[in-house]
């Protein structure tokens, strides 16, 4: 078995957040004996955007993947603590496919399936049998329209998605994720490989999604985090250094590591620690 749980269950009372939609509770995890995250506790409010920030290797992407159980099959993966979705441990879901319907994920680079544009949008809808077949086209049109891609593809729904531009492929993947009506949307640097125009379009759309979803985004782009998120969190060396309202974290951080990072001076964790 690739995934091993260490220690007992943890209680949600350790998380300082009012009825979060999702929460990590004393989460520690690692691979092959190396600790990657250490005692992380934080809540993600419903209908809000939370940005996860930190230098490369800080643990933020591993944390995001854990929220979707993407690390389960990685050799040597061990964890203790818990992650709660609506108060229920995500590790107690036997049907991982259903869990991932509720917690969708968009990756750094587009990953369309090797099937038609239409079939890409409907892949999850078919797998979960969400609507009758006669409603398939309506679902596809609604989601493609929502992400601003319908006009560009409506006359070539049977085409390969690999004929689309990189930005269009990412929008297609977003439409596919939203087609199964997730409650939480995880985004792993979704605009890092895109042009400024498509980036702006996706950022605006992310903000609109917060009206109905819990959105959690990993980003190295400080300006992006400031623009789109309601809350932000900073990771350093596997630790959650600070989290709170985005404006507060940028304008009056509580920790020296945070101050250095938002000022663009980070990169050496040891140097940041000397400033404490």
Curated annotation (Swiss-Prot):
Q: Name one GO biological process term.
A: phosphate ion transmembrane transport
UniProt subcellular location: Cell membrane
GO molecular function list:
ATP binding; ATP hydrolysis activity; ATPase-coupled phosphate ion transmembrane transporter activity
Q: How does it sit in the membrane?
A: Peripheral membrane protein
Keyword set includes Nucleotide-binding:
yes
Q: Which InterPro entries match?
A: AAA+_ATPase, ABC_transporter-like_ATP-bd, ABC_transporter-like_CS, P-loop_NTPase, PstB-like
ABC transporter domain span: 22-262
Q: What is its main location?
A: membrane
Q: Where is the signal peptide?
A: none
Top-level taxon in the UniProt lineage: Bacteria
Catalytic activity entry: phosphate(out) + ATP + H2O = ADP + 2 phosphate(in) + H(+)
Q: Where does ATP bind?
A: 54-61
Assigned keywords, A-Z: ATP-binding, Cell membrane, Membrane, Nucleotide-binding, Phosphate transport, Translocase, Transport
Record EC number: 7.3.2.1
Known role: Part of the ABC transporter complex PstSACB involved in phosphate import. Responsible for energy coupling to the transport system.
Assembly and interactions? The complex is composed of two ATP-binding proteins (PstB), two transmembrane proteins (PstC and PstA) and a solute-binding protein (PstS).
| Family per record | Belongs to the ABC transporter superfamily. Phosphate importer (TC 3.A.1.7) family.
Q: Can you name this protein?
A: Phosphate import ATP-binding protein PstB 2
> Per the UniProt entry, what species is this protein from, by scientific name?
Mycobacterium tuberculosis (strain ATCC 25618 / H37Rv)
């Amino acid at each position: 078995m690739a995934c091993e749980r260490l220690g007992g269950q943890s209680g949600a009372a350790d998380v300082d957040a009012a009825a979060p939609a999702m929460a990590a509770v004393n989460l520690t995890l690692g691979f092959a004996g190396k600790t990657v995250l250490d005692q992380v506790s934080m809540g993600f409010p419903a209908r809000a955007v939370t940005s996860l920030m930190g230098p490369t290797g800080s643990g933020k992407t591993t944390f995001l993947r854990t929220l979707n159980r993407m690390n389960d099959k990685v050799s040597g993966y061990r964890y203790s603590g818990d992650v709660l979705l609506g108060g229920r441990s995500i590790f107690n879901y036997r049907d991982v496919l259903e869990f991932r319907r509720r917690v969708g994920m968009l990756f750094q680079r587009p990953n369309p399936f090797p099937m038609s544009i239409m079939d890409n949008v409907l892949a999850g809808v078919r797998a979960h049998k969400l609507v009758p077949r006669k409603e398939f086209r309506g679902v596809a049109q609604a989601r493609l329209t929502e992400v601003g891609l319908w006009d560009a593809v409506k006359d070539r729904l049977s085409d390969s998605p690999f004929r689309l531009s990189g930005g269009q492929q990412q929008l297609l993947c977003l439409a596919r994720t939203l087609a199964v009506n997730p409650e939480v949307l995880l985004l792993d640097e979704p605009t890092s490989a895109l042009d400024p125009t498509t980036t702006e379009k996706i950022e605006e759309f992310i903000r609109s999604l917060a009206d109905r979803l819990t959105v959690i985004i990993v980003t190295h782009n400080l300006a992006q985090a400031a623009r789109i998120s309601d809350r932000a969190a900073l990771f350093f060396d596997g630790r959650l250094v600070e989290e709170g309202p985005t404006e507060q974290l940028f304008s009056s951080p509580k920790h020296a590591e945070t101050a250095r990072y938002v000022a663009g001076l980070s990169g050496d964790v040891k140097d940041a620690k000397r400033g404490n």
